[in-house]
UniProtKB/Swiss-Prot annotation:
Binding site for DNA: 94, 112, 157
Quaternary structure annotation from Swiss-Prot or TrEMBL: Monomer.
HAMAP family referenced in this protein's UniProt entry, alphabetically: Fapy_DNA_glycosyl
This protein's UniProt keywords: DNA damage, DNA repair, DNA-binding, Glycosidase, Hydrolase, Lyase, Metal-binding, Multifunctional enzyme, Zinc, Zinc-finger
Entry-linked InterPro entries: DNA_glyclase/AP_lyase_DNA-bd (IPR015886), DNA_glyclase_Znf_dom_DNA_BS (IPR015887), Formamido-pyr_DNA_Glyclase (IPR020629), FPG_cat (IPR012319), MutM-like_N-ter (IPR035937), Ribosomal_uS13-like_H2TH (IPR010979), Znf_DNA_glyclase/AP_lyase (IPR000214), Znf_FPG/IleRS (IPR010663)
Cofactor requirements of the protein: Zn(2+)
Protein name: Formamidopyrimidine-DNA glycosylase
């Protein structure tokens, strides 16, 4: 599933193409995604200029004068920029939406159809008040994210610290890979109760989250199965993981075998020596 780094890589790849350009038309081939694409979506965007592209959590927010169209990649979604100087590749089975510009096509592909393409009109208020966005946690690269915030929001909580990171109500975008990697960098065992982690350890964890996500963005995200960036290239962060998907292999720091457990129906990886 694309997480914050993969979505940010996509945003950075797309924005230079679309910002300041007008959508000539929208071709919706499959309206039944995770939620239905609005019936008048294509008409609403015809000839609209894209003012910019932002990211909130794992959502991409494309601003036009009349509002925002929101794209979520779901589990298997990608957005590709395809040149339009010659006929672009014919849409394949899982190519659901095309935004056609004068020189290129922005194509949304999603084999499992858990992604979404939605509309938020400007007269409904700021897009961040949209029901899907309003309750999200803080952005990990914002000034609001800190060890103090993690410490405050987890007092009295018995859920594991890894599950607290994944929940998304404190901080967004720390998916399964990045939670395991961040906890390793911070030296915190993922099974530790969130409410029992001290402030100094949470300060280390906040720094580790930022560093892990920044490294992942720099490497183009992680490609475990389907993800490619807007240029069609795979990400490479998974090749440098300290613990994720390395069960039984030696820790890159101490040499102890990496362990794998299941938490909340998801695999967790950690070093029993480096993480306490």
């Amino acid at each position: 599933m694309p997480e914050l780094p993969e979505v940010e890589v996509t945003r950075r790849g797309i924005e230079p193409f679309v910002a300041g350009r007008r959508v000539e038309r929208v071709d919706v081939r499959t309206a039944m995604l995770r939620w239905p694409v609005p019936a008048d979506f294509a008409e609403m965007l015809r000839s609209r200029e894209v003012l910019g592209v932002e990211r909130r959590g794992k959502y991409l927010l494309f601003e036009v004068d009349a509002g925002w169209f929101i794209v979520h990649l779901g589990m298997t979604g990608t957005l590709r920029v395809l040149p339009n100087d010659a006929p672009p590749p014919a849409p394949a089975k899982h190519d659901h939406v095309d935004w056609v510009f004068d020189e290129f096509v922005l194509r949304f592909r999603d084999p499992r159809r858990f992604g979404a393409v939605l509309w938020h009109p400007r007269d409904a208020g700021d897009v961040r008040a949209h029901p899907l966005l309003a309750s999200l946690g803080v952005e990990p690269f914002s000034a609001a994210f800190s060890g103090a915030l993690l410490f405050k929001r987890t007092r009295g909580r018995t859920v594991s610290v890894k599950q607290a990171l994944l929940a998304g109500d404190i901080v967004v975008g720390v998916g399964n890979i990045y939670a395991s990697e961040s906890l390793f960098r911070a030296g915190i065992r993922p099974t530790t109760a969130a409410g029992r982690v001290s402030l100094p350890r949470y300060e280390r964890l906040a720094d580790a989250v930022r560093a892990t996500l920044a490294d992942a963005i720099e490497r183009g995200g992680s490609t475990l199965r389907d993800f490619v960036g807007s240029n069609g290239e795979s990400g490479y962060f998974q090749l440098d993981c300290f613990v994720y998907d390395r069960a039984g292999e030696p820790c890159r720091v101490c040499g102890a075998p990496i362990r794998q457990i299941v938490q909340g129906q998801r695999s967790t990886y950690y070093c029993p020596n480096c993480q306490r």
